[in-house]
């Protein structure tokens, strides 16, 4: 028995930002975004369509932490009249911040207590969110959780509530044209990881796998060309659509081992999330092969009959994009690597992985690099 559910209404297509006024519908709104000129310009376009924002939060940082989020929630709580909807304009960090603000309308302390102890759920708020992603990869526009970082304690939390699904996702590939090469690659690899991680996942189902196969196949086929032709609108549309399908895939499964490994790497070494969660994919794939008929069938739809050769091709794909699959290139020695894997296998996301630690250890020496 399986179930699949996703309540987000998706509007996809070049120029679809023009529909933002219909989504806000004369409600007072809070805009959450980055303090960068390109986002100022898009914010002005939103204001022309939906009216001026009641509050603009521009202090979003990569990997939003407790300090930044506490300030954002305080601003939101102090705004009168209270915003009735949040417009999240940006990448994954903006989406995460917007979801925390949506839940922290009474202040960040309620969110903090819920994250740390699972307490005070009744104190969390549920302001609706309209998600406007400007990167192709986060998937957060169609999921119900946010990644929150407690940098003081060196911990990563996941804020997960059904009310955190955005009501609408407005996905306009035109907003992604200006993304630089490194960001284009890292965000697309995050989407690739979402897709593959939903396949080698205990929570996988035929619908999530269908979305994942499409997404992974498109990213593998299109990303190398896009990396060399960043202004190609057709390729941007393909990658944005693939990232959306990857989001729909893992929205019902969550991620697995590669993501579980990645979080301490980002915290300790500053490795961008999309790279941290993708460089280990060949190793994780090798440890998943042969564990589940359904998983193998899904992977064969992407990589062909010989899955070992497919893992090698995945490795070559990453290296050709300039992404090393060697842990040492991220400042990780053998001892830390084994500690990361042991910890990841027992983590919340690692427990979704269909393979065993013994299989992972066996795969460590495989591959061509």
Where are these regions (language model features)?
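Glycine/threonine-rich beta-strand-loop-alpha-helix active-site module
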Residues: 67-74, 78-174
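Carboxylate- and glycine-rich phosphate/diphosphate-binding segment that chelates Mg2+/Mn2+
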Residues: 145-253, 355
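Short alpha-helical scaffolding segments that buttress acidic/His motifs in well-ordered protein cores
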Residues: 192-196, 239-247, 261, 281, ...
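Active-site pocket-lining segment
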Residues: 264, 268-326
